[in-house]
């Protein structure tokens, strides 16, 4: 029987709704990943509601929790680390220390950094120190970097005028160290208004994926967290870059279809769980 991959997911959590680990953990489990959730913050709900309560995990607690895992002899079984929303730059540095420790225990372990700075329609949602940390430190350590358009623009200190510019910008990030760049949400002049577009760029390949853009009164939160988690999960399950990319795009679309059908603001992960595991429609990525 094939071994089930293990993934340490270090990002935010909400008690109500779906964002961060609350958006990513169940879908990753549903497709066959043993997930170890480590929550950088625990909030009552995601911040787009405009009010919330909760706490940020003290940075020193991150290595302390990993010490506990090492103490029971399981650290070498970790196949990947995923990091997302950070409450502080100190948390980020603690995560990079954890990544180094896990890679020492398992040299084949992967690190995917979802560099959460904001969303193009919402503006920057993290402290400036976190953005600086992501730009200057995390990108150099990540095997996979998964920015949205705003975050890609911040990394490259420019805005694109075309899809070709987006490819060039993503490719420039490869020089910092990542194996591949997944741009979870493209936005550039001339982009078709009725499509949602994603981009995957590695040293020897670039893939562009389009799917229908679904309309919502308020855009659901957690879509990027879901996409990053599914992409990394499919890589751990043996997919190549293109297939992991196409699977993530299709599974996220299934969740959004169910969310739209229910008239929900929060992602309908439970109702869509079978279609997350087995998307009904795949969108072919086009090689650029």
From Swiss-Prot:
Domain of life: Bacteria
UniProt xrefs under InterPro entries: PM/HMP-P_kinase-1 (IPR013749), PyrdxlKinase (IPR004625), Pyridoxal_kinase_PdxY (IPR023685), Ribokinase-like (IPR029056)
Binding positions for substrate per the UniProt entry: 12, 47-48, 225
Family annotation (Gene3D superfamilies): 3.40.1190.20
Binding locations of ATP: 114, 151, 184, 211-214
Enzyme kind, highest EC tier: transferase
Catalysed reaction, written as an equation: pyridoxal + ATP = pyridoxal 5'-phosphate + ADP + H(+)
SUPFAM superfamilies: Ribokinase-like (SSF53613)
Keywords noted in UniProt: ATP-binding, Kinase, Magnesium, Nucleotide-binding, Transferase
Gene Ontology, cellular component aspect: cytosol
Annotated EC: 2.7.1.35
Cofactor(s) it depends on: Mg(2+)
One GO term (biological process): pyridoxal 5'-phosphate salvage
A single MF term (Gene Ontology): pyridoxal kinase activity
Pathway(s) this gene product operates in, as recorded in its UniProt entry: Cofactor metabolism; pyridoxal 5'-phosphate salvage; pyridoxal 5'-phosphate from pyridoxal: step 1/1
One Pfam family it belongs to: Phos_pyr_kin
Similarity comment text for this entry: Belongs to the pyridoxine kinase family. PdxY subfamily.
Function summary: Pyridoxal kinase involved in the salvage pathway of pyridoxal 5'-phosphate (PLP). Catalyzes the phosphorylation of pyridoxal to PLP.
Record note on quaternary structure: Homodimer.
Family matches, as NCBIfam families: PRK05756.1, pyridox_kin
Protein name per Swiss-Prot or TrEMBL: Pyridoxal kinase PdxY
Lineage: Bacteria, Pseudomonadati, Pseudomonadota, Gammaproteobacteria, Pseudomonadales
The encoding gene: pdxY
